[in-house]
Curated annotation (Swiss-Prot):
GO cellular component terms, semicolon-separated: cytosol
Subcellular location: Cytoplasm
Disulfide bonds: none
Phylogenetic classification of the source organism: Bacteria, Pseudomonadati, Pseudomonadota, Betaproteobacteria, Neisseriales
UniProt keyword Transcription, yes or no: no
Function: One of several proteins that assist in the late maturation steps of the functional core of the 30S ribosomal subunit. Associates with free 30S ribosomal subunits (but not with 30S subunits that are part of 70S ribosomes or polysomes). Required for efficient processing of 16S rRNA. May interact with the 5'-terminal helix region of 16S rRNA.
HAMAP family in UniProt: RbfA
Record protein name field: Ribosome-binding factor A
InterPro entries in alphabetical order: KH_dom-like_a/b (IPR015946), RbfA (IPR000238), RbfA_dom_sf (IPR023799), Ribosome-bd_factorA_CS (IPR020053)
Organism: Neisseria gonorrhoeae (strain ATCC 700825 / FA 1090)
Gene3D superfamilies: 3.30.300.20
The keyword Cytoplasm is assigned to this record: yes
């Protein structure tokens, strides 16, 4: 007999938990002053929980490359801290990727505004 579906899958709950904990760890646990203001936007995990891709943005675009280096350097420490906060059989290996969706959205919005400004208004 098939189990009834819950509204929220376990994998989704784990992703949300990892995202919350990483956001807190990045905010309080990164001691490197070179890191900019980092926002964790999304976490994607594999079905076997062995890998997690963490999508992030930074407030100041000038610190983007430095922040990437800082996150890669702190990857092991962040994974270790996650293992203390989250009880999982396997803590996923973390992969950090800059989230360009916000920039793409802003450029698309600018293109739409440009086309709208060029098109004459008809009554």
């Amino acid at each position: 007999m098939k189990k009834p579906q819950r509204g929220y899958a376990r994998q989704d709950r784990v992703k949300e938990q990892i995202m919350r904990e990483l956001a807190e760890l990045v905010r309080t646990g990164l001691k490197d002053p070179r890191a900019g203001f980092i926002t964790i936007n999304e976490v994607e995990i594999t079905r076997d929980y062995s890998h997690a891709t963490v999508f992030y943005t930074v407030l100041n675009q000038d610190t983007r490359e430095i922040t990437e280096e800082v996150l890669e350097h702190a990857r092991g420490h962040l994974r270790s801290e996650l293992s203390k906060r989250i009880k999982l059989f396997k803590i996923p290996e973390l992969h950090f990727k800059y989230d360009e969706s916000l920039e793409r959205g802003m450029s698309l919005s600018a293109l739409i505004d440009q086309v709208a400004a060029e098109k004459p208004v008809e009554d």
